[in-house]
């Protein structure tokens, strides 16, 4: 019998001593018989050893049904795996990056907008380590399936490894909750692939399954397929073991996206852009330039024209400054500045800093997609607290001590018909048949900026779209609100531009304004003209304890 023959015993001993590979006797017998039939019985022992190993590399270990991992290892909360265990990798995925962005990159549809998330993206400090790749592997010994995580960077692993690749787990490996925590010394890649798995576990299909999307693309073959089965071919004929250098796949650094840290906000959406060289057709935005891309060129031309050194290497995106008509500010001169409004309600919002077509092409963000998630969250909060009722207030915020005749006159008509304490809702305003100018309070947030921060006739100006969960409204922020946020007026800004030592003061003011607008979710006092469909934000106010008490009284009444 072949099981007791000297050839089979020598092959089995060689596999275990050289590669730590264990195979069942029936498979080994059948493999040796097939090799001898194909090549004759005059093969040398070394040639038989080599061909048996190559056949094992191409075999699905499920067909062998030969266990090598400890029984029930996945059921233990914590254990250690010791010794040598030859296993098969069915698939792997990089869990350090969003699956959707990886999928889009594989399909050639990569976009910086795919990196925008609905969670807080903290700015990375210069001294902080860059995020590293973390692969999650699906392994099997033919009878048990187990996950393994790249606990430390492992050069032998990369995303191009073919499904069905064989590897040896060696040394002491900690296993927690059925997941092996792999370190570089724990993994030795042997190579190989399984043809049936190559089509089933392509990166495109694996990522598509993770996000619940059907993948209809043609199966992709790994870039390292040419050496999958021939890893040992160049080395087996030389000596006892293969060279690790020939078995290691080249490690490619994952492309990192720099997070705009110009706004160290605790909430809000951030766009992460791939770094690119500056040219006449492409614009370069680095970490501290998020403030600059929503400000007109003439406001920041001081720092550019005077060659002030900048860590960001910023260059302006916009070709033309946006000049606003002075008629848009007729209600602004009369508003007394609001002294402060600390951020009490930290709501995640998204600011799209698009002004012209060039920016819109680069930041082609679907506002409705983000808004749908934000509105859904707002509505859930309102339904849970039962405190967000569709009523409003007749009073301006207490932080505004007085108003002039112009703004007062614009906020008196039909006010009592729709404005009930402590604030009203956009759906109520938009549904009203009144055509008179109305001054109302809205608990709202900014959905998107409809232009850049600009100035005209000595007044600050920026337009935006706001929402409270029941509707949308295009508004313009008054000069007094923007001046309070920025910290200086337009004439004062022009003075600061002339002094190179004041550049930091100028930038800090703009950063503060953007941060406040990004984070704000509170009560806005808005003058709304339904006839012209125009609205001006007159003041901003946080949700105070007094407002909450008013809501509770309404609920009890």
Curated annotation (Swiss-Prot):
Biased composition (Polar residues): 259-275, 310-320, 383-397
Superkingdom assignment: Eukaryota
Coiled-coil residue windows: none
Cysteines paired by S-S bonds: none
Assembly mode: Component of the RMI complex, containing at least TOP3A, RMI1 and RMI2.
Protein name: RecQ-mediated genome instability protein 1
A Pfam family reported for this protein in Swiss-Prot or TrEMBL: RMI1_N_C
Gene this chain is encoded by: rmi1
Organism whose genome encodes this protein: Xenopus laevis
Similarity annotation: Belongs to the RMI1 family.
GO molecular function: nucleotide binding
Major localization class: nucleus
Biological processes per GO annotation: DNA replication; double-strand break repair via homologous recombination; resolution of meiotic recombination intermediates
